[in-house]
């Protein structure tokens, strides 16, 4: 047998397999010798032996097969043996890993223990070092004391009358007296010593000395160190204010208290050692610390002294007086400051105080620069600053009773967040007061004299009286600023800027001649605006909620007010040569300012209601940049004025005299009556209005200006002599603006304008269009100005424009009931996106037809006669009767109206109607023969009968909300803005109220 049954080392587990292998070996003539010989040998030797047998040709084939089966059995045995060895190795490795883990845990615990020991040793080392340093410090202190005592003994020899001890060499106490010089010297040296080296004075002048052995006893013998029965450490305050003395039992004591007491210094710390001086309770100083905790008065600093102080005291009654050439710096967080320092000429006291109460501010003379950063809650009296002083105050005070009076050539800068300011500073000539205040109440503003520039940045809630600024001054209000790097010095004819966020303004500033007050206020109430004299430019950017009376500004003034006020009852009256500018977002404006000759009122208001607009005299220019919700009456502006208005509603537009340029950029919702502009004026209606009831009538030489939101303008305007190009546009790119001759003002509000019109003399092309492309603009002849870019929802009556005028209607109109009649020499501009035009218009000499229409069907286009340029941009759905335009006129039909019932009759002219209408029943553009006149009259009668029908049968009209003045579609039963329901009335129609 090759293998034995039951041998687990063979690798075989089944007896059948072992029996089959043994039978094969025996059948082939083999023997168990090969298996037994290589049983314990490795597999390499078994394989080498098998190869030798197989390769030998002399060995029979049967023997080869028997050896092969034996080698197979040996291979299985080798594999089983290797598996056992591998299992043993794995077990050993697992044990080794466990041992390593245990070792690591032990090492970790040892490491933690060593770390704790290291920390303890380090702590002990630090404590030892601290103790050593303390010992060294004590040693140095003792050495210093010893040296001081020896030096004092060398300087002042000891008295010769002393009593020796009972035995030779025995030390005993000796009492003696000190003269006045010795006492003063000792006191002086004691005051110069450190705090830790102070020695407590004794009630009697008793000193202990060793008995002298030679003539030189001063500092040669060691002192007798006696132990006190009650040792007191250093820096220990005496409970009763009495100095502590160490009673020593001397053998012999000579006391002379009666003679010594008058010679004691009044106060002081005496040198260390065993010296003990006599002093009374009234004459002794505090025994431990000489730091004062209360100071009744400031020290007087003389000329050329720099006194820095950091006072955080709770009460400071009297301020320091700093003479000329001083710079006192105080950083005080005191709660109450009753009297501030008075600083003479040439000083600069910067005070950075966050005090809660400031009753009197410093009076600073000439060439001083006071700097104050105060967050005080109450300021009763502000500093009076003389000539050439620059007071700079950054105060967040809540109450300001009296503001500083600043003299000539001063620049006061105040950054105050005070809540109440009762009286503002009065600043004389050539002063620049700058105030950055967030005060809540301002009762009286500063009075600033000639050539002053007060600058105030106030977020005050209440302003009762604004500053009165004299000639040449300029109050500037820079508010809500966190830092002010450089403050300008502005001389005569300056521009004061004011930005105040006050909630209540009762009386505004009165600014004299050559002043420029500028106020940017977000106040909630303003009762009276400033009165500014000649050559002043008051600029107010106020977002106040209530403005009862606006400033009255004299000649040559430019009042600018940017207000977001909710109510404005009376606007300023500005005299000749003034330019009032109002940039207001007010909700209610009852009376606008009256501006005299050569004035330019500019207002940018988002007010909700404007009852009466300013009346501007000759040579003025009122500009109303307003986003108001309702404007009842627009200012009447005389000759050479430019009113600009951006309002949400305009009930009555201004009447502008000769040579005026009224500019109105308005997003008003309703316009009941448009301005009547005389000769030489230019009314510009930059409006995105929802309803326009009456469009202005503009006479000869008028310049309408348009506020454009155009995205591209390729060619810029060339404006000849006497023109005023005003581009108040929100354009993304400006490539080329039109070339406009003399006395023209081009204003375009278009998205793209590839080529602008060439307009002759006395023309002003203004385009306020959001059109996407305009490839070629009109060529307008002399004396005309065509501008009708309108997005109006309803237009009840269109203006009648005389000769040489320029009518501008920027509206998106849904219904156009009555078209305008335009006389001779007018140029209508049409921006229409028409889909189909079967027959183009025939335009005679000197005509520029521009038709860009979105109309669905246009069967026959108009025939336009001489000197007529009809431009229609209409998206109307139905056009029943078209207008007849006389010679030299231009029909402007830039409307996206839904219905157009009846147009006006325009003789001798054929208008260009570019409409998005579904059907055209009657076209007046045809030259009808006499046989068709009867049909034409019948159609007129039918249209008149349809026009006389009740409102229920007519097309729906947009309705305006009475609360928010928002325009709504007829299908809307609820206001889209304020969400209020419209109510029906008795006559069958619908009343929005």
Swiss-Prot record:
Transmembrane segments: none annotated. Residues 325-335, 944-957 have a biased composition (Polar residues). Residues 353-364 have a biased composition (Basic and acidic residues). Residues 281-381, 520-547, 894-959 are annotated as: Disordered. Signal peptide: none annotated. Pfam families: TEX13 (PF15186), TX13_rpt (PF20868), Zn_ribbon_TEX13 (PF20864). A zinc finger (RanBP2-type) spans 955-984. Keywords: Metal-binding, Zinc, Zinc-finger. GO terms for molecular function: mRNA binding; zinc ion binding. It comes from the Eukaryota. Belongs to the TEX13 family. This is Testis-expressed protein 13C. The gene is TEX13C.
């Amino acid at each position: 047998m090759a293998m034995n049954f039951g041998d687990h080392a063979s690798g075989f587990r089944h007896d059948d397999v072992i029996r089959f292998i043994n039978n094969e070996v025996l059948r082939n003539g083999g023997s168990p010798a090969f298996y037994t010989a290589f049983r314990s040998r490795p597999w390499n030797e078994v394989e080498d032996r098998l190869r030798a047998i197989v390769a030998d040709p002399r060995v029979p084939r049967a023997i080869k097969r028997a050896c092969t089966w034996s080698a197979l059995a040996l291979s299985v045995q080798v594999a089983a043996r290797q598996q056992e060895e591998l299992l043993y190795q794995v077990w050993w490795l697992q044990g080794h890993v466990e041992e390593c883990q245990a070792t690591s845990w032990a090492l970790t615990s040892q490491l933690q223990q060593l770390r704790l020991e290291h920390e303890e040793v380090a702590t002990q080392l630090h404590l030892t070092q601290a103790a050593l340093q303390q010992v060294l410090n004590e040693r140095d202190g003792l050495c210093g004391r010893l040296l001081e005592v020896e030096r004092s003994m060398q300087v002042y020899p000891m008295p010769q009358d002393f009593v020796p001890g009972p035995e030779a060499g025995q030390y005993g106490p000796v009492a003696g007296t000190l003269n006045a010089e010795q006492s003063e010297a000792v006191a002086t040296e004691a005051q110069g010593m450190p705090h830790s080296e102070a020695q407590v004075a004794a009630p009697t002048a008793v000193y202990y000395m060793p008995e002298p052995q030679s003539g030189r006893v001063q500092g040669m013998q060691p002192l007798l160190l006696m132990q006190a029965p009650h040792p007191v450490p250093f820096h220990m305050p005496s409970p009763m204010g009495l100095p502590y003395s160490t009673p020593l039992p001397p053998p012999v004591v000579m006391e002379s208290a009666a003679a010594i007491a008058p010679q004691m210094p009044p106060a002081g710390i005496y040198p260390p050692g065993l010296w003990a001086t006599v002093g009374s309770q009234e004459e002794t100083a505090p025994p431990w610390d000489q730091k004062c905790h209360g100071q009744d008065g400031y020290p007087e600093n003389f000329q050329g002294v720099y006194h820095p102080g950091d006072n955080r005291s709770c009460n400071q009654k009297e301020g320091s007086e700093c003479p000329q050439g001083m710079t006192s710096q105080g950083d005080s967080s005191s709660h109450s400051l009753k009297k501030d320092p008075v600083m003479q000429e040439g000083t600069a006291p910067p005070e950075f105080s966050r005090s809660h109460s400031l009753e009197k501010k410093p009076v600073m003379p000439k060439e001083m620069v006071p700097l104050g950063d105060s967050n005080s809650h109450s300021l009763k009296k502000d500093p009076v600053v003389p000539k050439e002083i620059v007071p700079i105050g950054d105060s967040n005070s809540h109450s300001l009773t009296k503001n500083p009076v600043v003299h000539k050539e001063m620049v006061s800068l105040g950054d105050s967040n005070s809540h109440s300011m009762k009286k503002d500073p009065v600043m004389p000539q050539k002063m620049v007061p700058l105030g950055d205040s967030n005060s809540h109440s301002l009762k009286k503003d500063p009075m600033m004299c000639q050539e002053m520039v007060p600058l105030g940045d106030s977020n005050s809630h209440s302003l009762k009286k604004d500053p009165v600024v004299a000639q040449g001054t300029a109050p500037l209000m820079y508010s809500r600023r966190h830092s002010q790097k450089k403050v300008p010095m502005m001389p005569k004819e300056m521009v004061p800027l004011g930005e105040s966020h006050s909630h209540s303004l009762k009386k505004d500033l009165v600014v004299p001649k050559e002043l420029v007050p500028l106020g940017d206020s977000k106040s909630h109430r303003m009762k009276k605006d400033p009165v500014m004299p000649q050559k002043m430019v008051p600029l107010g950017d106020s977002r106040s909620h209530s403005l009862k009376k606006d400033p009255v500004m004299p000649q040559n003034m430019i009042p600018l007010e940017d207000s977001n006020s909710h109510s404005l009852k009376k606007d300023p009256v500005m005299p000749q040569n003034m330019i009032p500018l109002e940039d207001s977002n007010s909700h209610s404006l009852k009376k606008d300012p009256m501006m005299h000759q050569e004035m330019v009122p500019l207002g940018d208001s988002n007010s909700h209601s404007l009852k009466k607009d300013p009346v501007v005299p000759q040579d003025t220019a009122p500009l109303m940049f307003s986003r108001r919700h309702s404007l009842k009456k627009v200012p009447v502006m005389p000759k050479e004025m430019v009113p600009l208005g951006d309002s949400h509603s305009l009930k009555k537009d201004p009447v502008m005299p000769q040579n005026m340029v009224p500019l109105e950029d308005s997003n008003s919702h309703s316009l009941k009556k448009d301005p009547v502009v005389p000769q030489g004026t230019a009314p510009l209606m930059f409006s995105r209005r929802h309803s326009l009831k009456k469009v202005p009538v503009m006479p000869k030489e008028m310049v309408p200006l348009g506020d454009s939101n155009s995205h591209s303008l390729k060619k810029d305007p060339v404006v000849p002599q006497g023109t005023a190009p005003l581009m108040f546009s929100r354009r993304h790119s400006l490539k080329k603006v039109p070339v406009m001759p003399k006395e023209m003002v081009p204003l375009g509000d278009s998205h793209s304008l590839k080529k602008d019109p060439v307009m002759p003399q006395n023309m002003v092309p203004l385009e306020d269009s959001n059109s996407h492309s305009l490839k070629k603009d009109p060529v307008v002849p002399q004396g005309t100005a065509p501008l009708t870019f309108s997005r109006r929802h309803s237009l009840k009556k269109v203006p009648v424009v005389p000769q040489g005028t320029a009518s501008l209607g920027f509206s998106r109109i849904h219904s156009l009931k009555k078209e305008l009649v335009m006389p001779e020499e007018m140029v209508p501009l049409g921006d229409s996106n028409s889909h189909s035009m079967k027959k183009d218009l025939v335009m005679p000499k000197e005509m520029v037809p521009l038709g860009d229409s979105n109309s669905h069907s246009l069967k026959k286009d108009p025939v336009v006669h001489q000197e007529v340029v009809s431009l229609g941009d209409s998206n109307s759905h139905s056009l029943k009767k078209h207008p007849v335009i006389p010679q030299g006129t231009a029909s402007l039909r830039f409307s996206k109206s839904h219905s157009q019932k009846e147009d006006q009759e325009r003789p001798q002219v054929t208008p260009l109607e570019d409409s998005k209408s579904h059907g055209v029943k009657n076209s007046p553009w045809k030259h009808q023969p006499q046989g068709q006149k009867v049909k034409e009259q019948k159609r007129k009668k039918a249209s008149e009968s349809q026009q006389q029908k009740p409102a229920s049968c007519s097309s729906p009209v947009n309705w305006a909300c009475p609360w928010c003045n928002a325009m709504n579609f007829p299908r809307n039963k609820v206001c889209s803005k304020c969400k209020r329901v419209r109510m029906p009335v008795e006559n069958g129609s619908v009343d929005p109220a």
